[in-house]
């Protein structure tokens, strides 16, 4: 009997497992305990007594917990700047809101501590202020979860609740980058017989017009095709937005994002705007309403086949708009 219920391989969870192992060694409770083990405990306790109110110290002592599990102090962050990530995760702040300029945290200067493990010149004199701010919200957290009986396990669970979305966001970003690279590689294959030069972020091809055509990675839109009219003077031809997310329920939000990018591209003179998606089902009528600037919608899956109606349409249009003849038949 053939089983009709088939699930995809849990690749993302496998990736998460390895990422979580790395997180535990750098940002989670394991890293904190390893750091404290090699520190001068007297110096640490002196600062904890200075930064943490007596009632909170007493509450933690009741449960046999050291205060640094919840409260950061300068000597600790100076010993291991990566631990800023632990306290950020524990308080439930995403990287975007904690370090972003538009959230009002004023914590952007500390990002290198979590990301690179070093304290910048601007951040160094503000470490004390950072710790006071953390200790204030940590006190609120301690009071708020008090009825649940505070424990190391609970604190570890709270950090993991913030890690999850961060890992998923990282996976989504990676999926997005992979999708852009895949579409770029497909274009590269289509024009390979006319390539004049391959650079890290661009392909230069010889067109039938005698002018160079550049196919490039770009920040917004994702891929652009431009024709060089003269030195440093280009005709903008094609703007391509790649939306690699596989969540069907979210695809129309992504198409809305593509529309914003294409509107900018139109403003810069691009004559063709394409949107490449990575979902199996797409309501084309709805998609066209959400992105009227998109001339053509393509599927990453169909393009990856290197054959079929969508791929052939994509191939013909790339060749036509770059003024390149088709590759000779072997």
Swiss-Prot record:
What family does the database annotate?
Belongs to the XcyI type II restriction endonuclease family.
| GO terms assigned for molecular function | DNA binding; magnesium ion binding; type II site-specific deoxyribonuclease activity
Q: Which cofactor does it need?
A: Mg(2+)
Please give the catalytic activity noted in the UniProt record.
Endonucleolytic cleavage of DNA to give specific double-stranded fragments with terminal 5'-phosphates
Name under which the protein is recorded: Type II restriction enzyme Cfr9I
**Mind telling me which residue stretches traverse the membrane in this protein?**
none
What top-level class of enzyme does the UniProt entry assign? hydrolase
What top-level branch of life does the organism fall under? Bacteria
Q: Which InterPro entries match?
A: Restrct_endonuc_II_XcyI
Keyword Nuclease in annotation: yes
* Protein species of origin: Citrobacter freundii
Q: Which Pfam families match?
A: RE_XcyI
Q: Does the keyword Magnesium apply?
A: yes
UniProt keyword annotations, A-Z: Endonuclease, Hydrolase, Magnesium, Nuclease, Restriction system
Q: What is its EC number?
A: 3.1.21.4
Please provide the Gene Ontology terms (biological process) for this protein. Answer: DNA restriction-modification system
Q: Point out the signal peptide segment.
A: none
């Amino acid at each position: 009997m053939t089983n009709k219920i088939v699930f995809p391989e849990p690749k993302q969870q496998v990736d998460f497992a390895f990422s979580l192992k790395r997180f535990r060694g750098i940002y989670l409770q394991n890293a904190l305990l390893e750091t404290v083990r090699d520190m001068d405990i007297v110096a640490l306790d002196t600062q904890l007594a200075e930064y943490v109110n007596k009632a909170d110290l007493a509450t933690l002592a009741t449960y046999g917990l050291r205060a640094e599990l919840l409260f950061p102090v300068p000597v600790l962050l100076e010993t291991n700047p990566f631990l800023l990530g632990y306290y950020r995760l524990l308080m439930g702040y995403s990287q975007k809101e904690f370090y972003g300029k538009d959230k009002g945290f004023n914590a952007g200067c500390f990002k290198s501590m979590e990301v690179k493990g070093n304290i910048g010149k601007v951040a160094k004199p503000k470490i004390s202020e950072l710790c006071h701010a953390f200790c204030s919200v940590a006190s609120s957290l301690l009071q708020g979860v008090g009825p649940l009986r505070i424990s190391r396990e609970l604190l570890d669970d709270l950090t993991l609740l913030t890690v999850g979305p961060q890992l998923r966001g990282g996976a989504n970003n990676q999926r997005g980058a992979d999708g852009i690279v895949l579409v770029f590689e497909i274009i590269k294959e289509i024009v390979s017989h006319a390539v004049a030069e391959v650079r890290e972020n661009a392909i230069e091809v010889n067109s039938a017009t005698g002018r160079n055509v550049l196919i490039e990675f770009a920040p917004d839109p994702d891929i652009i095709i431009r024709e060089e009219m003269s030195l440093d003077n280009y005709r903008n031809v094609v703007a391509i937005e790649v939306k690699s997310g596989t969540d069907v329920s979210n695809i129309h939000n992504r198409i809305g994002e593509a529309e914003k990018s294409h509107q900018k591209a139109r403003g810069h003179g691009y004559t063709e705007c394409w949107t490449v998606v990575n979902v199996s089902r797409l309501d084309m009528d709805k998609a066209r309403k959400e992105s009227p600037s998109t001339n053509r919608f393509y599927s990453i899956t169909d393009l990856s086949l290197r054959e079929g109606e969508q791929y052939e349409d994509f191939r013909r249009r790339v060749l036509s708009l770059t003024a390149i003849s088709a590759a000779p038949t072997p």
